[in-house]
C-alpha cells in the first residue's frame, strides 16, 4: 500500500498528515487558514489521493509557517508513500483553465528538487492567506518530495482563479506521475533508480 503518515512538531507548528496514493477518501484538511484548506482539498481531489491534515501554527504571527511547514510535511509524506517509485510514470503535465485564467504544472519525480514559478498575484491577500505563500508552499513541496516542478500562469487576472488553477494543475500532474504503468518495468530511468 502506497501510504504514509507523518507527525512533525516545531516551536512554530504542530502537524499530523496522512496520504494514501491509492485511495481517494478521506480528504479532511484543518490548518486554520481557510483559503489554504480549500486549495489543499482541491489538490487532493484532482490528484485523486486521500489526504488528511491537522495543523496548528502560530497564526497570531501570520500563516507563513503553517503553509510552508504543511508543504514540507506533505512533500515528505508523498516521497515516503512512493517508496522506490517502481512502475510509476514519473512525469506529469496538466493545463487547467478557470474562467479567464489558464495555469500549467509540469513535474518530474526525479529525486532532484527544483521549482520554476511564474505567477503574479494582483491581490496580496485571499482571506487571511497571503498570495506570496502560493510559491512558498510549492517550494517546500518540491524540495521535500524531491520533485522538479514547473508552474506557470499563461494568462489570467483574478488572484483566486490563478491560485486555484495552479493547485488543481499540480494535483492532476501528480496523479499522472504517480500512476503505475504496467508497461514500465522497474523505475522509469536509464540510471536504474530515482
Curated annotation (Swiss-Prot):
Its EC number is 4.2.1.19. It holds the Pfam family IGPD. The keyword Transit peptide does not apply. One of its GO terms (biological process) is L-histidine biosynthetic process. GO terms for molecular function: imidazoleglycerol-phosphate dehydratase activity. It catalyses: D-erythro-1-(imidazol-4-yl)glycerol 3-phosphate = 3-(imidazol-4-yl)-2-oxopropyl phosphate + H2O. One of its GO terms (cellular component) is cytoplasm. Pathway: Amino-acid biosynthesis; L-histidine biosynthesis; L-histidine from 5-phospho-alpha-D-ribose 1-diphosphate: step 6/9. The keyword Amino-acid biosynthesis applies. Its main location: cytoplasm. It is an enzyme of class 4 (lyase). Belongs to the imidazoleglycerol-phosphate dehydratase family. This is Imidazoleglycerol-phosphate dehydratase. It comes from Streptococcus gordonii (strain Challis / ATCC 35105 / BCRC 15272 / CH1 / DL1 / V288).
Amino acid at each position: 500500500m502506497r501510504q504514509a503518515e507523518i507527525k512533525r512538531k516545531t516551536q512554530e507548528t504542530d502537524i499530523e498528515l496522512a496520504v494514501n496514493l491509492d485511495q481517494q477518501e478521506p480528504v479532511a484538511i484543518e490548518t486554520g487558514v481557510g483559503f489554504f484548506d480549500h486549495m489543499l482539498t482541491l489538490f487532493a481531489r484532482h490528484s485523486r489521493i486521500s489526504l488528511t491534515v491537522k495543523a496548528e501554527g502560530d497564526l497570531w504571527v501570520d500563516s507563513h509557517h503553517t503553509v510552508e511547514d504543511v508543504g514540507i510535511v506533505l512533500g515528505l509524506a508523498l516521497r515516503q508513500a512512493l517508496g522506490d517509485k517502481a512502475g510509476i510514470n514519473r512525469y506529469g503535465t496538466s493545463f487547467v483553465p478557470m474562467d479567464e485564467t489558464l495555469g500549467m504544472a509540469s513535474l518530474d519525480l526525479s529525486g532532484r528538487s527544483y521549482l520554476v514559478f511564474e505567477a503574479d498575484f494582483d491581490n496580496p491577500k485571499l482571506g487571511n492567506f497571503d498570495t506570496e505563500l502560493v510559491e512558498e508552499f510549492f517550494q517546500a513541496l518540491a524540495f521535500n518530495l524531491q520533485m522538479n516542478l514547473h508552474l506557470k500562469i499563461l494568462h489570467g487576472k483574478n488572484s483566486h482563479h490563478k491560485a486555484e488553477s495552479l493547485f488543481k494543475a499540480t494535483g492532476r500532474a501528480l496523479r499522472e506521475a504517480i500512476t503505475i504503468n504496467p508497461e514500465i518495468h522497474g523505475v522509469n530511468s536509464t540510471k536504474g533508480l530515482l
